[in-house]
Amino acid sequence: MPIVKVRENEPFDVALRRFKRSCEKAGVLSEVRRREFFEKPTWERKRKKAAAKKRLLKKLSRENARRIRLY
């Protein structure tokens, strides 16, 4: 859990912004959304496999775009 210590004479808004940023970096909100409902192991594997496929296609399309720009 991210911890933010409020500095002396620091406005609440600034401290809240720092806390939100640290929560985002730690992935707290995405973890809560992921754990909101039970996910069967088969669904989890399917989701991870789809994410890996998406990453691979994205990487390949970026490499292909670079090749096209070189010519």
From Swiss-Prot:
Family assignment from sequence similarity: Belongs to the bacterial ribosomal protein bS21 family.
PANTHER family: MITOCHONDRIAL 28S RIBOSOMAL PROTEIN S21, SMALL RIBOSOMAL SUBUNIT PROTEIN BS21
InterPro entries in alphabetical order: Ribosomal_bS21 (IPR001911), Ribosomal_bS21_CS (IPR018278), Ribosomal_bS21_sf (IPR038380)
GO MF entry, a single one: structural constituent of ribosome
Pfam families: Ribosomal_S21 (PF01165)
HAMAP family: Ribosomal_bS21
Keyword Ribosomal protein: yes
Gene Ontology CC: ribonucleoprotein complex; ribosome
Domain of life: Bacteria
This protein's encoding gene: rpsU
Protein source organism: Pseudoalteromonas atlantica (strain T6c / ATCC BAA-1087)
Protein name: Small ribosomal subunit protein bS21
Keyword terms, alphabetized: Ribonucleoprotein, Ribosomal protein
PROSITE patterns referenced in this protein's UniProt entry, alphabetically: RIBOSOMAL_S21
Gene Ontology biological process: translation
Transmembrane segments: none
Gene3D superfamilies reported for this sequence: Ribosomal protein S8
